[in-house]
Regions:
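NAD(P)H-binding glycine-rich loop region in Rossmannoid oxidoreductase-like domains
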Residues: 39, 50-91
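NAD(P)-dependent short-chain dehydrogenase/reductase
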Residues: 124-125, 154-205, 210, 248
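Glycine-rich Rossmann NAD(P)(H)-binding loop
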Residues: 171, 175-177, 197-204, 229-239, ...
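Active-site Tyr-X1-5-Lys
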Residues: 131, 138-168
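Amphipathic terminal alpha-helices
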Residues: 288-317
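Conserved Rossmann-fold NAD(P)-dependent oxidoreductase catalytic core, especially the SDR/UDP-sugar
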Residues: 97-144
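Mid/C-terminal beta-alpha module of Rossmann-like enzyme folds, strongest
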Residues: 216-268, 273, 308
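N-terminal Rossmann NAD(P)H-binding glycine-rich loop of SDR-like oxidoreductase domains
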Residues: 7-26
Length: 317
């Protein structure tokens, strides 16, 4: 685990960034930035020893930040409808580029991208590799993501070369292990008796657990290079989301209904090839079914409401 470093985390209030920040804060000087519209939301981060700053990345003003961070984790992301594409590009592409310029002395910078970068493949079980075509995907729950993902990757690649700045671009698959993740939304939908909607049946994913992300982070940062290094950040197992729902149905004693709702241009599956990542980090340490059961036991008692179910692809768009 990384220790004794000065680390900046953008979008620190995000569901991936929060546990990473808290884990890193135990042995490092961690700074976290976000908009922090409600000042009270800063309290748990400050209590954990994280220095916070209210910064809107889209504004491009980083005068309130030092420039001597040893590591940068760029996890900030704005989800937006297609009519907000200009705002999304400022927040997801232009602003981060200016931040990288400000933090160009960092030893390593991790830039989070995602599966939305890939052009769809007709086989839902296709394992997307880092060399696959990019740029033509459509995501119904975040239509500005494909353009933004391509944009931030291009800016990161430019900054790596222009500033001699070691960068690793991590294409994140489905995140698992906390109550607001897509697998958790599937559990809530099953418990609420909702139909599980997806672009295809089957709709396989390669989820990665937060515990694996925490211990793999040091190796991922060590892979940062000039030119930028691109790698899928995914789990080692691939499983359809319909199977997650069936497990939740089995444990709850509920029947589960499914519906396939194809979206023009959208991928039928979200499977990542973990080969390159495994060469860097070694194999994952968690087993999906075991961790999904733990998540079920955590989520089930509080399943009276479903938050943001459309994002979890469990309600028809």
């Amino acid at each position: 685990m990384i220790s004794g470093q000065k680390i900046l985390i953008t979008g620190v209030t995000g569901m991936v960034a929060t546990p990473l920040a808290h884990a890193l804060a135990r042995d490092n000087e961690v700074w976290g930035i976000a908009r922090f519209a409600d000042p009270e939301t800063r309290r748990p981060y400050e209590t954990a020893g994280i220095t916070t700053r209210a910064i809107d990345i889209a504004a491009g003003d980083f005068s309130d930040l030092p420039d001597d961070f040893t590591h940068v984790l760029h996890l900030s992301w704005m989800r937006a409808e297609i009519d907000q594409l200009q705002q999304a590009l400022r927040a997801n592409v232009e602003g981060p580029g200016l931040l990288f310029q400000h933090c160009r002395k960092a030893k390593a910078t991790l830039v989070m991208s995602g599966m939305g970068i890939y052009s769809p493949h007709p086989d839902p079980w296709h394992l997307y590799s880092e060399s696959d075509p990019i740029g033509r995907g459509a995501t119904s729950y975040a239509p500005t993501s494909p353009a933004s993902k391509a944009g931030i990757e291009a800016v990161a690649r430019f900054c790596a070369r222009a500033f001699d700045m070691p960068i690793v671009i991590a294409r994140l698959n489905t995140y698992n292990g906390t109550p607001l993740t897509m697998p958790a939304h599937v559990i809530r939908a099953v418990l609420a008796g909702k139909t599980i909607h997806a672009p295809n049946d089957p709709c396989p994913h390669s989820p990665i657990h937060i515990d694996d992300m925490i211990w793999q982070l040091e190796a991922m940062l060590d892979a940062a290079s000039t030119p930028a290094f691109i790698v899928n950040w995914c789990g080692d197992e691939t499983m359809p989301m319909q199977d997650w729902a069936r497990m939740a149905g089995e444990w709850s004693g509920r029947s589960v209904d499914f519906a396939a709702d194809p979206v023009a241009g959208a991928p039928l599956g979200s499977c990542s090839d973990p080969t390159l990542r495994r060469s860097i980090t070694g194999p994952c340490r968690t087993v999906f079914r075991d961790e999904f059961r733990k998540l079920y036991d955590q989520v089930a008692p509080a399943s009276a409401t479903i938050r943001d179910a459309k994002w979890g692809a469990v309600e028809k768009p």
